[in-house]
């Protein structure tokens, strides 16, 4: 089975792509399902897209990228199906998807609630060209729809009968659990994210200040070299793919604060929680989105909302090594059973094959 994979970003750059279709390739290829990637963005568009301003350059590169997509239509006969990650083009109506659907079955992956209007802080003007209503149309015209969270599945099932829920997965060949990590000294509380989510840590600055004042642990924050925290003794560093696992291994308790100021957040599958758990980090997270399903309060982690709840959860884990080790084992077991590439491999392959059945 030969599949043309239409992805928004160049391969290897987008966290969403890396944690889904690019990772799925590891189980699809041995099953005889070959992917040919076709990114929407040009190299120049990738460089400027998330910068403030640069409207002229963005507009030129958007047009160039869109016309590049049109050339794809002449190559469809070489493929058995077309995989669309989120949308065939970053802007505009579902024209490309409609033209594709007339010729080939579409496997559509929706891992964010693109149907909920949202104005990007760095691309406010272009947000008005997003055509949020097109998502319902793409879901309806697709042969297969793959989603990663329960709320998005509930939306998709209103418009398509062939919906497969596959969580954002962790590769256990890379994220290898070692129970000894929970015995490391000094103990470490930490967070990992990206520059766009650094603001999430500010939500729990008060709790971190109180935890830091106890002097009972290190605090490691990954994703930026400046988190803008006051009164919190911490180490800050940028995220890198090469050091991702080693950096996380230094942490025993993984923080997952989520703000309620983004209308997309309640729909999301929080990949970071699954990554923490796969390595045996005990998660402490906001009771929002997939955290309410993935984190089983008091069994494989804690849910925390108020400042006191954050402090109590973290300090309890710091003071009780047996509780921490027990929750660590359960977290790793749950991640392997439900949120790993290996445990979801058969479902991923079956979803793709259903496009041509």
Question: What would you call each of these model-derived segments?
Answer:
Residues 316, 323-338, 347-350:
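A short, well-ordered alpha-helix in the C-terminal region of glycosyltransferases
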Residues 67-79, 90-108, 112-115, 125-144:
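Membrane-proximal helix-turn-helix segments that form the acceptor-binding/catalytic region
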Residues 295-308, 316-322:
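Conserved acidic donor-binding segment of nucleotide-sugar-dependent glycosyltransferases
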Residues 341-357:
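C-terminal alpha-helical cap of glycosyltransferases
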Residues 11-27, 171-174, 182-250:
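Conserved catalytic-core segment of nucleotide-activated headgroup transferases in glycan assembly
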Residues 41-55, 107-136, 185, 264:
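Acceptor-binding helix/loop patch of EC 2.4 sugar-transfer enzymes
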Residues 151, 169:
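Carbohydrate-associated surface elements
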Residues 199, 235, 242-278, 284-293:
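Nucleotide-sugar-dependent
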